[in-house]
């Protein structure tokens, strides 16, 4: 299994298709997020799906149960591998979403705590736990309810794996080739994330902003076994 999910963070449909075509044999999946979905909607997802690369649709759904269930109903018709929704939307929201995808290819992945957030950010929201404790709590809830996996940083991946078992998928964003500063707070290198127990690592700019995205993806994959 190729653990790389390449984030196609663009509003340009042609650019997304070009990346997807060039990377389909180099990565495990491509990620389409809110930026792309706001610009192109379901039809844009269908166009990228024609490139024959699995799609991780990262919409982070978070609304009342009925609204999320109806949204999942619409999305399940798309050819996507995984769809994200916030675990903090609650048990009822998650269970109703799961009921929609029973027997379908699409897997529901729960978002724990955004990697852009740290302990101070959670405290401002009235969350008394530190980020790691909050992630573990939410991951255990997701597992109990029946979600297929979670999104969490590499800093929590090892404990999530211990608590939730080997078949529970762990997707890790906040992947950086070095420890530079940007909009992410809880980060790790690709190898650190995999060694911590992640099944998939989400990598965007180090691949898409390189002069040769396919070659960059190959080098990252090779670095995981060096």
UniProtKB/Swiss-Prot annotation:
Lineage top rank: taxon: Bacteria
GO cellular component, one term: cytosol
Catalytic activity: orotidine 5'-phosphate + H(+) = UMP + CO2
SUPFAM superfamilies: Ribulose-phoshate binding barrel
A Gene Ontology biological process term: 'de novo' pyrimidine nucleobase biosynthetic process
Active site residues according to the UniProt entry: 60 (proton donor)
Keyword check for Lipid metabolism: no
Entry binding sites for substrate: 9, 31, 58-67, 115, 176, 184, 204-205
An example Gene Ontology molecular-function term: orotidine-5'-phosphate decarboxylase activity
UniProt cross-references to Gene3D superfamilies, sorted A to Z: Aldolase class I
EC number: 4.1.1.23
Pathway membership, UniProt: Pyrimidine metabolism; UMP biosynthesis via de novo pathway; UMP from orotate: step 2/2
Enzyme class, broadest EC rank: lyase
Keywords (A to Z) from UniProt: Decarboxylase, Lyase, Pyrimidine biosynthesis
Subunit comment: Homodimer.
Listed HAMAP family: OMPdecase_type1_B
Protein family according to the UniProt entry: Belongs to the OMP decarboxylase family. Type 1 subfamily.
Family annotation (PANTHER family): OROTIDINE 5'-PHOSPHATE DECARBOXYLASE
Entry function: Catalyzes the decarboxylation of orotidine 5'-monophosphate (OMP) to uridine 5'-monophosphate (UMP).
The protein, known as: Orotidine 5'-phosphate decarboxylase
Organism: Wolbachia pipientis subsp. Culex pipiens (strain wPip)
UniProt lineage: Bacteria, Pseudomonadati, Pseudomonadota, Alphaproteobacteria, Rickettsiales
Encoding gene, per UniProt annotation: pyrF
């Amino acid at each position: 299994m190729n653990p790389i999910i390449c984030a196609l963070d663009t509003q340009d449909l042609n650019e997304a298709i070009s990346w997807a075509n060039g990377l389909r044999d180099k990565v495990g999946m491509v990620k389409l997020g809110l930026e792309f979905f706001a610009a192109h909607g379901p039809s844009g997802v269908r166009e990228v799906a024609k490139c024959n690369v699995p799609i991780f649709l990262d919409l982070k759904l978070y609304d009342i149960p009925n609204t999320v269930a109806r949204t999942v109903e619409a999305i399940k018709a798309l050819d996507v591998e995984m769809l994200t929704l916030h675990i903090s939307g609650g048990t009822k929201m998650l269970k109703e979403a799961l009921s929609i995808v029973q027997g379908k290819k699409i897997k529901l992945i729960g978002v724990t705590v955004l990697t852009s957030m740290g302990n101070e950010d959670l405290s401002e929201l009235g969350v008394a736990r530190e980020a790691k404790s909050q992630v573990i709590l939410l991951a255990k809830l997701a597992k109990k309810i029946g979600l297929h996996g979670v999104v969490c940083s590499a800093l929590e991946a090892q404990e999530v794996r211990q608590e939730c078992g080997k078949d529970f998928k762990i997707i890790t964003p906040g992947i950086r080739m070095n420890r530079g500063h940007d909009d992410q707070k809880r980060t790790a290198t690709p190898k650190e994330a995999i060694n911590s127990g992640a099944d998939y690592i989400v990598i965007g700019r180090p691949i898409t902003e390189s002069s040769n995205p396919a070659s960059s993806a190959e080098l990252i994959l090779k670095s995981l076994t060096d």
